[in-house]
Structures are given as structure tokens and as C-alpha cells.
């Protein structure tokens, strides 16, 4: 009888341990939004348009998983910590908002295939790095081209 009792307890504890194992929940992240700029339509109309093309990301960044560098030579892409929305689109929107805030010569706008923007000035950003680091820093590296 004792043997059956101890076997039952062991089985119960074993099954309870398996069923209460922590389940990893994923988290979704967005970049912080920039403050919107409020200008009159006449102020906007006086500025030449600057078309901000979608940011081009290095291939290892162009996915939903947040990228983290674990050593000088290794990067990993998170499975449970992901971007809630395309990081390329988020960065493009943030660049447009920041340029509207921090300069007054152009009126930055996102590329729009429904409008003829062929004669407008254009800005193309490319990011080779946009990741966290094992040193506790964020790494951002890239370039820009204007037309």
C-alpha cells in the first residue's frame, strides 16, 4: 500500500511539474512615435517636397524578430521579442516626422505611388546595423543618398 501511495505521489508531482512549466510568451514592440508637427496648409505648400523612400535594411534585419549581437561575430534574431509592425516602415515614418520637426526647408513625405513624385527631391536611407549589443548599447549604422 505504501508503495502505491508513493508511486501515486511521484506521478502526481511529475505531472504537475510538467504542466506548470513556464510558457514563454512573446512580446511585440514599436518604436516611439515622434511628436507631430502642426503647420498651416499654406506653410506646407511653400516648401518643396522631400520624398523619403522606404528604408532599405540589411537582409538579416528585414524580419520581425529583434536582432541582438551576442559577441563580436555573432548575431541572433529573437523568436519571442518581435517588431509589431515592419521595422523598415516604422523607421521611415520616424524619419519623416523627425525631419518635419528639425528642419524647415523641405516638407518631408513618404513615397506614394498614387502621386507623381518624379520631379521631387528624394532621400534614400540604408541601414546595415540596427540592433542591440551584448555591451548594452544599440548599434545603428548606415548611409543616405539624396537625388
Role assignments for model-derived ranges:
Residues 20-39, 102-147:
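Surface-exposed short loop/turn segments
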Residues 33-53:
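N-terminal secretory signal peptides
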Amino acid at each position: 500500500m505504501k508503495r502505491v501511495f508513493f508511486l501515486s505521489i511521484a506521478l502526481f508531482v511529475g505531472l504537475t511539474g510538467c504542466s506548470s512549466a513556464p510558457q514563454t510568451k512573446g512580446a511585440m514592440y514599436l518604436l516611439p512615435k515622434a511628436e507631430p508637427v502642426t503647420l498651416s496648409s499654406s506653410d506646407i505648400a511653400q516648401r518643396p517636397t522631400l520624398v523619403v523612400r522606404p528604408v532599405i535594411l540589411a537582409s538579416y534585419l528585414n524580419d520581425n524578430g529583434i536582432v541582438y549581437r551576442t559577441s563580436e561575430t555573432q548575431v541572433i534574431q529573437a523568436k519571442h521579442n518581435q517588431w509589431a509592425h515592419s521595422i523598415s516602415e516604422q523607421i521611415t515614418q520616424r524619419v519623416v516626422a523627425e525631419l518635419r520637426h528639425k528642419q524647415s526647408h523641405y516638407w518631408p513625405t513618404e513615397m506614394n505611388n498614387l502621386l507623381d513624385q518624379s520631379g521631387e527631391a528624394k532621400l534614400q536611407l540604408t541601414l546595415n546595423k540596427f540592433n542591440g549589443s551584448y555591451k548594452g548599447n544599440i548599434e545603428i549604422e548606415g548611409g543616405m543618398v539624396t537625388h
